[in-house]
Regions:
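Extended, histidine- and acidic-residue-enriched regions that form the cofactor-binding/catalytic faces
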Residues: 3-117
């Protein structure tokens, strides 16, 4: 039965990132926490490293007003996310920061997969 052979691994790409790398990535703006990093410094920096042609810096906005919630609720209240979808600023993003992130987590993610599969 395939159910007996299937294996699923759930991991966040940022979990193996050392604290000192987080400090380097966020040396210009405060680290807002992973819940707020959607379309912010880390994800934008990764896109600048992987596919810079897809990053439109002129569209970056500074967002204010999103507040952390210690739980999840569905459906998500309409006022929980600003209209831009951005929860934290991306203004200090760079391809160099993206490469720093890649270099710090990729090998660790491969090790996790090698161990489990």
């Amino acid at each position: 039965c395939i159910r007996d052979r299937a294996k699923i691994l759930i991991a966040n790409w940022w979990d193996p990132m050392p604290a000192e790398i987080i400090d380097k990535v966020f040396d210009e703006v405060p680290f807002p926490g992973w819940a707020f990093e959607h379309a912010a410094v880390t994800e934008t920096s990764l896109m600048m490293a992987f596919a810079p042609e897809l990053v439109h810096e002129e569209r970056m906005v500074d967002t204010q007003g999103a507040t952390p919630c210690p739980y999840h609720i569905y459906p998500v209240p309409k006022d929980a996310v600003p209209p831009t979808g951005v929860l934290a600023p991306a203004r200090s993003s760079s391809a160099a920061r993206g490469q720093l992130i890649i270099d710090s987590v990729l090998d660790e993610l491969v090790k996790i997969c090698d161990k489990e599969f």
